[in-house]
A protein has these predicted regions:
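Structural preference for solvent-exposed beta-strand-turn elements
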Residues: 1-138
Length: 138
């Protein structure tokens, strides 16, 4: 299996305003993607939910600056794999299935490990769908 990813046309600069729907799942994905950008990503009117707050806290725990204001949120990314966290950092995903399934893939190339925890409901879910492929990548 080839484990290399080749990006032919790398985006050098992207400055646009995107109107996102007030969707919890999209907001979590935005937070994770913004953590990988270089510089400031800003989202206005993020929905207020426990799952989104768990995602923002997770991004903070991996060493990315998050500034939450009344009507917007900024994430100041460090670029691809620009994580600054200690080995065995504990991240609480709360009840967010989206976060708990996407974050491990995002952090798979990190030299440090995380301990991903969640509430009772999340802890009962089957994660073999993500564990098996991640193990194949090493």
């Amino acid at each position: 299996m080839n484990k290399n990813i080749f990006i032919q046309n790398k985006i050098k600069n992207y400055k646009k305003k995107i109107d996102m729907p007030g969707d919890k799942s999209i907001s979590i994905r935005w937070a994770l993607l913004a953590s990988q950008a270089i510089g400031i990503s800003r989202a206005y009117n993020l929905p207020n939910s426990d799952d989104i707050n768990s995602a923002l806290n997770a991004v903070r725990k991996i060493g990315i600056k998050v500034i939450k204001k009344k009507n917007y949120c900024e994430i100041i990314g460090n670029g691809l794999n620009g994580f600054l966290f200690k080995n065995n950092t504990i991240i609480n995903a709360g009840n967010s299935g989206t976060l708990s399934r996407l974050l491990p893939g995002l952090l798979a190339k990190s030299k440090n490990s995380i301990i991903l925890k969640g509430d009772k409901s999340l802890s009962k879910r089957d994660f073999s769908r993500i564990i098996k492929p991640l193990n194949l990548f090493g």
